[in-house]
Amino acid sequence: DALAEQPYVDGVSPSVNSSVTGRFKDIEASTTVNGVSEDFFYVRGLNFQSGQPFDKQSINEQAQDVVIDDNTKKTFFTDGTDPVGQVILLGSVPSRIIGVIEPQKSMMGNSDSLNVYLPYSTVMSRMLGQSNVRSIIVRIKDEYPSAAAENAILNLLVQRHGAQDVFTQNADSIRETIQQTTATMTLLISAIAVISLIVGGIGVMNIMLVSVTERTQEIGVRMAVGARQSDI
């Protein structure tokens, strides 16, 4: 709540995770369970292809409502059945599907992993048996520099905890690192291509030089008897 009240914060969601076996009828698959709040989908900019997100009441009641991603839909509902309203088993917890989010492309490209989203209160109590939130996702307002907001968040948490027992990750910084790495790899590949062209050119030149050297005597005889350059 303290984070949500900050002027630079546009949205906040707790986040807890667990890996379980998901089951629907006779289909089983490894599934990542994400425990989040009702604001998570706005914070991450996720859109729904069908159904809807859970609400504050679901959080308070530890409801077994689940939102699934497109990969989960394709894995468990291969016959085209509408997932909304169906019940899947996540570990030992039966959960009713209330929404399906649109396919998302991450900074690292497309992923085949299955992700489902339940109220964080449900995941903590029914799956993990814990009371501590492992991480918090914060969306910063567009008009605020992300680096400055990151420092302000860290200072706020250190002040409230009395010690620096947390760390932050900035999505903008990660994106910039990936872009820089991609640019470096592009330059490296271009340099390798140039070197290959130079080596190839030297090889062709050497072959031509050897050919001319081997025919020096023949060329001299032809020129002596009046051969033109075009004849040679």
Annotated model-derived regions:
Residues 39-54, 64-161:
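Mid-to-C-terminal secondary-structure elements
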Residues 203-232:
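Interfacial "coupling" helices/loops that link adjacent transmembrane helices in transporter permeases
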Residues 83, 185-210:
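Internal alpha-helical transmembrane segments of multipass membrane proteins
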Residues 21-25, 105-109, 175-179:
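A short acidic, helix-capping loop that chelates divalent metal ions and anchors anionic groups
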Residues 1-32, 39-42, 75, 124-125, ...:
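Hydrophobic, regular-secondary-structure patches
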Residues 145, 150-153, 159-193:
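Peri-transmembrane interface segments
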Residues 21, 85-89, 167:
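Residue-level detector of beta-strand face positions
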